[in-house]
Amino acid sequence: MKPEPTTADLQAYRAPWWLPGGNAQTIWPALWARRHFGPAPVWRRERWTTPDDDFIDVDRAVLDSHPQAPLLVLFHGLEGSSSSQYAVAFADFAAAQGLAFAVPHFRGCSGELNRAPRAYHSGDFEEIHWILRRFAEADPQRPLIAVGISLGGNALLRWAGEMGQSADATVRAVAAVCSPLDLAAGGHAIGRGFNRQVYTRMFLNSMKPKALRKLAQHPGLFDGEALRAARDLYQFDNLFTAPLHGFRDTQD
């Protein structure tokens, strides 16, 4: 896929003077930024059965788009959902541009725990593949555009890399936003100082309870006491994410 230059490519982003640094630019929009300029998005939820007989939930924005208008599919970030501020902002953008818009939730992120003894991870390109193929086959008249935020961008780019030129048969374009392409460096950074106290704590407060509910679903799946004691994402991934998805450890 050859990227096509757009006006946006030629415009350099400049943060407001009163919003310096990455932390301020991350936290302020999440808590206080205006999420949409038009009406708040209305979602229609679909439940899709996965190839391994589990399920994911897909939220489609109810928009008045042309039947042949492109479909913009957003893959959310770690512990994100269609309620995330960026998903709402993208839905607002799609409405303004006349696009169709959908947010497929990674497993366990739609508000209901999935059934299978697995969750999701940043290299889950097989999951991306069947989701995109289903969108493409369900709406063959619509060009398909995919964007991934953070972890979702990692998984989407992994899929694009695995597919190579054959990705053209499924999507018109892909984009990743704020994705930690160097996972080792990103993991090290989020486990230190301010990042550890704010972001790591926020993620673990969401991920640990879901993991323990998964353990209740599947007794013996992992060491629950060790997971309760995990203090950073590296330890959590070693105990939960890596073994559940066939990896030796976080480094693998």
Regions found by a protein language model. Give the residues of each.
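Short beta-strand element of the alpha/beta-hydrolase
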Residues: A69-G77
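C-terminal subdomain of alpha/beta-hydrolase-fold enzymes, centered on the catalytic histidine
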Residues: D252
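Catalytic nucleophile-loop/oxyanion-hole region of alpha/beta-hydrolase
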Residues: F93, R107-I145
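N-terminal cap/lid segment of alpha/beta-hydrolase-fold proteins
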Residues: G22-D64
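Short substrate-entry loop that stabilizes the transition state in hydrolases
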Residues: L78-Q85, A95, S110-L113
